[in-house]
Amino acid sequence: ITHHNSLDMELYLRIAPELYLKRLIIGGFEKVFEINRSFRNEGLSVKHNPEFTMIEFYAAFEDYHYLMNFIEELFKSLFDSLGFKNTVTYQEQAIDITKKFERINFHDSIIKFCDSISSENLNDYSYLESYCKNHDIEVSVKDSLHKTQLDIFEKEVEGKLIQPTFITEYPTAVSPLSR
């Protein structure tokens, strides 16, 4: 049970199936998944709905390369089962589901999509702060280098990722679940 702050009401949903699935992995199952409804009491926004359906899965003894390949094949199989051929149109963009999904690391994606950011200035906090000011990206005085890079990624890169893409090497400083 939790109280939803934005809607001022009591809700009875779990936040994730993680604990139950990990117990199964510890119990000897090598691969597990669940499709479920979850709830996160983190407010409402265009990027976040507190109640949502998700799929969560775990595979013992595998690495993130295996997981990316698995997800790619899962989506291709799903689209094929739904009768889509080579492309699907989403928000007037043709998504080619036959090509290998792009894999690009977090920092390289910023360099790729932000013309004036390079490997030489990507870790220069003063430069990034100035970049943010010139591109209407809000930065707090307390923000770290990685948080500022994340703000740039969210504002300048995310919207340009049209084709299926895996962003790897996400900074651990801004995501407790990344490695």
Q: Where does each model-flagged region fall?
A:
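Metal-assisted phosphate- and nucleotidyl-transfer catalytic regions
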Residues: 81-179
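Hydrophobic (often cysteine-bearing) scaffold residues that line and stabilize catalytic clefts
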Residues: 13, 17, 67-71, 145, ...
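Internal, well-ordered alpha/beta segment that forms a basic, Gly-enriched binding/recognition surface
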Residues: 17, 30, 63, 74, ...
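Class II aminoacyl-tRNA synthetase-like tRNA-binding/catalytic domains
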Residues: 1-66, 76, 133
